[in-house]
């Protein structure tokens, strides 16, 4: 996190595929999308991420044509599709339930859309088999859905969605019904398939890890509004506000008070009772309240014994959890605040552990912190 870990931002050369401008949507008189503008680029894997009820699925359904906008405009490849019926939008959707026809074989499920489009009969078999090969199911063509695993059914749904070569594929929480191991496998397969096909994917999820793993770009939503739009690394390491910081992964939030500005980048501040320098990229005044944000893996801890003195935030180990590659500890500061620390095991160093109630000093690399204004005291 913070300044020293920022990426070099490269200008995007991608061309817009979908443009939503001034979108507004109400249900039963309640405004769920108040004013939304969003551009989705050709060939990217974009994820709409947010808690239940944030409006992400509504945005997906508006793009698909399954809901109509109350105001605003939707463009697809520079064509206004705001009032174009769903079946004429060259957009396909994969739902959480997959919605396979149980009485049809895998082949017939995938061929269904082609038959509905009156595709010439001679083209159907090669196109269906090509789609099944893409998802590694060509040998399952004559099976029925009930003879497939959940992951295989999911891949059939994707094959059915891509067989007619849509410009855009929408996926609505389409991995959430799978078990953990299969979900991880399908995340990798979906991303690889998207690269292979070159089709733009828009994926809806509330699972932060899923979004970070699969996406070229993440749009974080709350209450029908976009809170932040950026790459997974930007969203994780440079959250724009406390909502994004708290929603994406674990994060520690320390209270701070400005003492003085030292230079263009650094501020001297009191952070949870300890004076230190922090990097602040906006104007501040002495006495102003701030939040200093640090991921558990960005903290450094040192055991304090009776015969040594250590600088930093002082606390005591209250919980520790071995996670294989990491040791996660909960440290209670002297003021009562709980801090999560994640330490990685290095195979070249001896293993370590901390006893409960062990006294600890917590520090971090200067400039790795993200500093935000206190939203209650702006």
Curated annotation (Swiss-Prot):
It is found in: Cell inner membrane. This is Spermidine/putrescine import ATP-binding protein PotA. It catalyses: ATP + H2O + polyamine-[polyamine-binding protein]Side 1 = ADP + phosphate + polyamineSide 2 + [polyamine-binding protein]Side 1. GO terms for cellular component: ATP-binding cassette (ABC) transporter complex; membrane; plasma membrane. Changing residue 54 to T: Loss of ATPase activity and transport. Keywords: ATP-binding, Cell inner membrane, Cell membrane, Membrane, Nucleotide-binding, Translocase, Transport. Induction: Transcription is inhibited by PotD precursor, probably only when excess amounts of PotD are produced. It comes from Escherichia coli (strain K12). Changing residue 135 to M: Loss of ATPase activity and transport. Part of the ABC transporter complex PotABCD involved in spermidine/putrescine import. Responsible for energy coupling to the transport system. GO terms for molecular function: ABC-type polyamine transporter activity; ABC-type putrescine transporter activity; ATP binding; ATP hydrolysis activity; nucleotide binding.
């Amino acid at each position: 996190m913070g300044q020293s870990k920022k990426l070099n931002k490269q200008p995007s050369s991608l061309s817009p595929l979908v443009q939503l401008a001034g979108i507004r949507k109400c249900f039963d008189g309640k405004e769920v999308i108040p004013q939304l503008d969003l551009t989705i680029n050709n060939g990217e894997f974009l994820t709409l991420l947010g808690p239940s009820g944030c409006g992400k699925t509504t945005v997906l359904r508006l793009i698909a044509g399954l809901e109509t906008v109350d105001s605003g405009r939707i463009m697809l490849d520079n064509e206004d599709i705001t009032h174009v019926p769903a079946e004429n939008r060259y957009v396909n959707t994969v739902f959480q339930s997959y919605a396979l026809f149980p009485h049809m074989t895998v082949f017939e499920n995938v061929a269904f859309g082609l038959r509905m489009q009156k595709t010439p009969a001679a083209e159907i078999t090669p196109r269906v088999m090509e789609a099944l090969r893409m998802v590694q199911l060509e040998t399952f063509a004559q099976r029925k859905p009930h003879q497939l695993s959940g992951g295989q059914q999911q891949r059939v749904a994707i094959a059915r969605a891509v067989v007619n070569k849509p410009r855009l594929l929408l996926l609505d929480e389409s991995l959430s019904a799978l078990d953990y191991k299969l979900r991880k496998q399908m995340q990798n397969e979906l991303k690889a398939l998207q690269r292979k096909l070159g089709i733009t994917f828009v994926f809806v999820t509330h699972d932060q890890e899923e979004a970070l793993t699969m996406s070229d770009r993440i749009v974080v939503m709350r209450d029908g509004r976009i809170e932040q739009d950026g790459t997974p690394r930007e969203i994780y390491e440079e959250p724009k506000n406390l909502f994004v910081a708290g929603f994406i992964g674990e994060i520690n939030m320390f209270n701070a008070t400005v003492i003085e500005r030292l230079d263009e980048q650094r501020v001297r501040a009191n952070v949870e009772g300890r004076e230190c320098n922090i990097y602040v990229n906006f104007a501040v005044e002495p006495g102003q309240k701030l939040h200093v944000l640090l991921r558990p893996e960005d903290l450094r801890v040192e055991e304090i014994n009776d015969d040594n003195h250590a600088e930093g935030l002082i606390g005591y180990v209250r919980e520790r959890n071995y996670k294989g590659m990491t040791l996660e500890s909960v440290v209670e500061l002297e003021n009562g605040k709980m801090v999560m620390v994640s330490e990685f095991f290095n195979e070249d160093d001896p293993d370590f552990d901390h006893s409960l109630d062990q006294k600890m000093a917590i520090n971090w690399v200067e400039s790795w912190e993200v500093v935000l204004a206190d939203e209650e005291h702006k």
